[in-house]
Amino acid sequence: MSKRHSAKYKLDRRMGENIWGRPKSPVNSRAYGPGQHGQRRKSKVSDFGLQLRAKQKLKGYYGNITEKQFVRIYTEAARRKGNTSENLIALLESRLDAVVYRAKFVPTPFAARQFVNHGHVLVNGKRVNIPSYRVKPGDVVSVRERSRNMALVLEALQSSERDTPDYITLDAKGMSATFVRAPELAEVPYPVKMEPNLVVEFYAS
C-alpha cells in the first residue's frame, strides 16, 4: 500500500468517518481512531478542536491539499463578495482535479491529482497538468485519447458508487465533461457532512 493510500485511510480512522464513501474504508468495520489508543473514550472537543477537525476533513477530502494552497484558496474566498463558506466550496470544486473526479474519470481525488499531473487531461482541447488549475463555467474537460483505455478510467466510469453532479454535464462516450457552473455547498455530493463555516471560523479567529 502506498504512503498516500495509507494516509488516506488513516484520515478516515482519525475522523471516524468514511470521508470518500469508499467500500474498503476501515471505518466500515471499526469507528475509532488509528493507533493503540484509538479506542479510548472521546472527551468533549473544544470549539477550536471542532474547527480544526472541519478544516482537516475538508482539506483531506480534496487529496490532502497543502496548508499553503488551502490558505490561498480561503483567502480568495474571503476576498470575494458573498458568503465565504460558499465561496470556499465553489473554489475547491472548480479545481481541475476536482472536476476530473466529479466526472468519474478516476476513482478518487488522489487519483485525480496524479492523473492530471501525468498529462492525461485536456481543457478545451489543450493539455493541462496542473491539478489546481481553475476551471471556468463552460470549459470542457476531457481525457486524452491515448489515455481513454486505461483500466483506472474504465473502472471509474462504470462504477455505481457515485453519480455525476448537476453542475457537470458528462459525455461518457466521448470521455468529456462540461463544467456548467461553480456549485453551492448543498449541491456537492459529499459522502459525509462538511462544515466550511467552521473552517472560516478557524482562519478568522
From Swiss-Prot:
GO terms for biological process: ribosomal small subunit biogenesis; translation. Disulfide bonds: none annotated. GO terms for cellular component: small ribosomal subunit. Coiled coil: none annotated. Keywords: Ribonucleoprotein, Ribosomal protein, RNA-binding, rRNA-binding. Part of the 30S ribosomal subunit. Contacts protein S5. The interaction surface between S4 and S5 is involved in control of translational fidelity. One of the primary rRNA binding proteins, it binds directly to 16S rRNA where it nucleates assembly of the body of the 30S subunit. With S5 and S12 plays an important role in translational accuracy. This is Small ribosomal subunit protein uS4. It comes from Phenylobacterium zucineum (strain HLK1). The gene is rpsD.
